[in-house]
Amino acid sequence: MEAKAQARFVRVTPQKARRVVDTIRGKGAAEAVAVLSFAPQAAAETVRKVVESAVANARVKADTASVRFDPADLVIAEAYVDEGPTLKRFRPRAQGRANQVLKRTSHITVIVAERQKEGAR
């Protein structure tokens, strides 16, 4: 069983968010939440919320299908960050000039799936 969660238009740069997402890819869902809870990066909180949402979505999906659900069996199957729209702002500089400031946004996607059994193919 697979479940997906997204956070769109998050005000964190995709480059910084990808650093966080790369640390949890392939880990168990519970382990990923634990790692993100103590990560110093600002994007870690948003990514943690997306992982928790994906686990909750998996629970709802299992309940709807009347299937046994164990959150310990969930693993981060896919996690990626896409670039969202960029907000363009201007900062006043000397001599009447202005520099452009790019405020980047991200779309964070996490897909959790059940861990493959050892004997299964």
UniProtKB/Swiss-Prot annotation:
Signal peptide: none annotated. The keyword Acetylation does not apply. GO terms for molecular function: rRNA binding; structural constituent of ribosome. PROSITE patterns: RIBOSOMAL_L22 (PS00464). Transmembrane segments: none annotated. Keywords: Ribonucleoprotein, Ribosomal protein, RNA-binding, rRNA-binding. GO terms for biological process: translation. SUPFAM superfamilies: Ribosomal protein L22. One of its GO terms (cellular component) is cytosolic large ribosomal subunit. The keyword Metal-binding does not apply. It holds the Pfam family Ribosomal_L22. Part of the 50S ribosomal subunit. PANTHER family: CHLOROPLAST 50S RIBOSOMAL PROTEIN L22-RELATED, LARGE RIBOSOMAL SUBUNIT PROTEIN UL22M. HAMAP family: Ribosomal_uL22_B. This protein binds specifically to 23S rRNA; its binding is stimulated by other ribosomal proteins, e.g. L4, L17, and L20. It is important during the early stages of 50S assembly. It makes multiple contacts with different domains of the 23S rRNA in the assembled 50S subunit and ribosome. Belongs to the universal ribosomal protein uL22 family. This is Large ribosomal subunit protein uL22. The lineage of its organism: Bacteria, Bacillati, Actinomycetota, Actinomycetes, Micrococcales.
